[in-house]
Amino acid sequence: MKKIVVLALATIPLVAAPLAQPPNRSSKLAVYAAVGEELIAFGVDVDHATLTRQSSVTLPGFVQEAWASPSAPFLYVAWSNGGSSYTGSGVTPVGDKHGVTAFRVDPSGALQVHGAPASLRSRPIHITGDVPGRHLLVAYNDPSGVSVHTIDADGSVGAEVPQPGGLDVGVYAHQVRVLPSNRAVVLVTRGNQPTASAKEDPGAVKVFRYDASTLTNRASIAPGKGFGFRSRHLDFHPTRPWVFLTLESQNTLGVFRRDDDSLGELPLFSRSTLPGAGGVIAGQTASTVHVHPNGRFVYVGNRAGGTTDFNGTPVFGGGTNNIAVFRINQETGEPSLIQNIETRGFTPRTFAIDPSGRMLVVGNQNTMAVRDGTTVKTVPPNVSVFRIRADGELDYMNSYDVAVGRKPLWWVGLVALP
């Protein structure tokens, strides 16, 4: 297996690359799974819902998130040597190096470094690009923030674009997305739960006007002034004006109307992502959300990773790790829960759907000790593959272990190959 090591902020000759055609439903695909600082490429057979492990690259810090250009064969990978991705990994975080590295994606899915990495101000928690693929947008959680960076004509990461002062970036940003019109940006800010020593920080979805790479404040969507509103991730319906938002500690899927490049102040619908009544459950949280390419279904990750003691060993303490499947009413946008299916691993932080809508790939994040009668077994992080049926429900197909010590599987994505 080929493995490439990427140096932090090294000077690397730029390589001009031809533009690829936009991905389509028949494109060949690669799955990328980030385990610590290693980004592993898998070949994909969508017809049989199988993966084949191929090459990997190593970043200067743990991979946080990645984004594939819609118009050229490049993958932009955000990384950091600090932050919560290091928790429980056995690696001590330093927290002094953060960046984005551009890779050219070849037809096999192998990655080649393209240009010098761009240094970032702090740990990036999410990365995306604008609709034409001319700029990168990066979200930061602590302190909360957002930055915009040019993508140069050759596909390399360019300069950061200065922004006006006074941007309302909330508390603990978790995701940044560009609206389909390319005229607005949303920063999903989670806030923080109250503790014995600190008051609750409210959550909100911050909406910015986006004009030629410049952000200006437009709206703050914060039902109940953001208290009890732990907004984490959102996704857009492909053809209707609906936005689907996960509320992390509330284990809830909210549906908001998208209108005039902003969001409605209150949700149209709120539904539990759990099989029961849902609500706040200790150790149980929602993760990311993706709308099916046909717009008829929406999928949400449910995570549980708490532990309890068993003969001196911390073992899984209960809860559910599953994907919630909702059918979307095409007239109103109302989601109806039709399935919760276990992910065959622990803490499904991220997942992805292939462009044809036939396969869903889950990244089960954590290593977990599990009680097995009178003994304890260890379940490593893994990539689980599911078939998506015509009715939207999922069938489990395969799992692939990706253990590297106790490093987490922090991100998984599907990318169309050139």
Q: Where on the chain are the PLM-derived regions?
A:
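Surface loop/turn motifs at the tips and blade-to-blade linkers of beta-strand repeat domains
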Residues: S56-P60, A116-L120, P164-V169, A222-F227, ...
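Asp-box/WD-like beta-propeller blade repeats and closely related beta-sheet repeat scaffolds
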Residues: L111-P180
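Signature of short aromatic-glycine-proline-rich micro-motifs recurring in repeat-based ectodomains
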Residues: A173-Q175, S231, V280-P293, P348, ...
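Short loop/turn segments immediately following beta-strands, especially the blade-tip
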Residues: F42-A49, A102-A110, V148-V157, V207-L215, ...
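Residue-level detector of Asp-centered blade-edge/turn motifs that repeat once per structural unit
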Residues: N24-S27, P70-A72, G129-G133, P180-S181, ...
